[in-house]
Amino acid sequence: MKKFYSCLPVFLLIGCAQVPLPSSVSKPVQQPGAQKEQLANANSIDECQSLPYVPSDLAKNKSLSNHNADNSASKNSAISSSIFCEKYKQTKEQALTFFQEHPQYMRSKEDEEQLMTEFKKVLLEPGSKNLSIYQTLLAAHERLQAL
């Protein structure tokens, strides 16, 4: 399936998200489910490894799969790398969802800057550690609406 890249304006997520083209523009190639999943995982891993701020253990260990390795340290590194990539993917998807639901922040640099200012304030509040990126962005959005 052809995809285009949409850059997210979130200071935490420097990178681009793959967004499927509308069905009228592209026709997906039929693949068995397992092949689609493997391809998606490979793309996610490649994208994760290419980040400029990848944790040092991920940068050293380019293999994110947990193959039968003799060294337990390499297994732990592969597992922590997989966790990092999964968290990155979830965070990126949540931010993309928020900006799809609230496109006004994509259209106006001023609105985006106000959102990021409120976003930082929400992050600094006690009890905000357990909030997801989506919940934090939504809280910042609601504060802006209340002003």
UniProtKB/Swiss-Prot annotation:
Location in or out of the cell: Cell outer membrane
UniProt entry tagged with the keyword Signal: yes
Lipid-linked residues (S-diacylglycerol cysteine): 16
Pfam families (alphabetical): InvH
UniProt keyword Signal present: yes
Signal peptide: 1-15
Role description: Involved in the synthesis of the type III secretion system (T3SS), also called injectisome, which is used to inject bacterial effector proteins into eukaryotic host cells. Pilot protein that is required for the proper localization of the secretin InvG/SctC in the outer membrane. Required for the secretion of the Sip virulence factors.
Entry protein name: SPI-1 type 3 secretion system pilotin
Native source organism of the sequence: Salmonella typhimurium (strain LT2 / SGSC1412 / ATCC 700720)
Phylogenetic placement of the source organism: Bacteria, Pseudomonadati, Pseudomonadota, Gammaproteobacteria, Enterobacterales
Name of the gene this protein is made from: invH
